Amino acid sequence: MNRKLPTGIISIIVIILLIGLFLITSNLNNTQNVEDEGKAKIIISLNFGEKILKEVMVESGISVIDALKSVANVSLAYGGKFVVSIDNISSDLKEQRDWFYYVNGFLANVGAADYIIHPGDVVRWDYHCWKTLLVNSELQDFPYMFTKGYSNKTYPLVVVYEPTFRNEAEKIYNFMKKSVTVNIVKIENLTREILERNNVILLGKSSKLVEEINSRYDELGWKYHLSGDYVVDIHGKKYRGAFAQITQSPYNSKGIGACENILLLIAGNEEYVGTVVDILLNYKIDSFWVMEGEPL
C-alpha cells in the first residue's frame, strides 16, 4: 500500500534540499558577488594557512599595503616597502619566519605598495617559515587562481587525466565550466603548448609527466611528493594516500614567478584521489595544500 508523506515533512525536506543547493553554489558565486560590490577580501593567516587570524572585506582600487593598514596594525621597513610585523607578529630572522602575501593564490611578484587590488581579489597575508619551503602559490583560496587570476588576468583551463581518474576529472570539469573557459583531455593528448599557455589541472599517478613534476617538488615548494606507491612529506614520512598541490607553471617560459598560469597536480592512490577532489570542490581546504591518507 502506498502512503503519502505528511505535508509538513515534505516541506521540511524541500527546505533542506534548497539550503544544500545554496551552500554548494554560494561559494562558487562569491567571486562575482564580491566583484559586483567593488569589494575584495583580505585574509591574515599563520603557518601556511593553518590558522586564520582575520578575514575582512576591503575596498578595491587601493594598494595591498593600504588595504592591510586599514584592517591591521602594520610595521614596515625598507622605505615602507617590506612588511615586518602584522598585529604584533614580527619577522624572525633566526627562525626564518616572515610575512608573505598572495593574490588569488599567487605569491605576488611586486611589492605590496605596487599591487592595486581588483574587485573580487582575495589577498592573503601568511606568516610562515621559509627555511624548507619557498611556496610560489597556495591552494587554500581555490578556485580564485582560475576564476580571477593575477592582476585581473586569467588563462583558459585544461583538465588533464590518466584513464584511472576519468570520473574525478569529469567532476572537476563540470564544476569549473560554470565559471571559466575549460576543456578536458586525456593525458596522451596533452601537448607542450597546452602546458605552456594554459592553466592545467592534472590528475594522475604513473605518467612520465607526473613523475617529472614530482621530481621538482623541492623547487616548487611542495610539502608532499610521490615516491613509487607512496606519498612522502618533507620530513620523509610515508603515507598511502593522495594530495593536491599547486604551483605557478614550471612550463611557462618566464618561470615560476611570472604570476601567469597555474598547474594543479592531484596525484596518488586511487582510493584517496576522489576524497581529495571532494575536499577541493566543497571548499574544505584548511591549508596551502590537501593530503588525505594513512601513515605507514
Each predicted region: which residue ranges?
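Short, solvent-exposed loop/turn motifs
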Residues: 50, 107-108, 238, 295
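Secretory targeting signatures
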Residues: 1-33, 201
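Solvent-exposed alpha-helical segments and adjacent loops
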Residues: 119-296
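Hydrophobic, secondary-structure "cap" segments at the distal end of domains
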Residues: 65-115
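Surface-exposed patches in mature extracellular/periplasmic domains of secreted proteins
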Residues: 54, 74-84, 182-191, 289
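Eukaryote-biased recognition of intrinsically disordered, low-complexity regulatory segments
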Residues: 33-57, 142-155
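Extracytoplasmic
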Residues: 37-39, 51-53, 62, 96, ...
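Residue-level recognition of short, solvent-exposed, well-ordered loop/turn junctions
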Residues: 59, 118-119
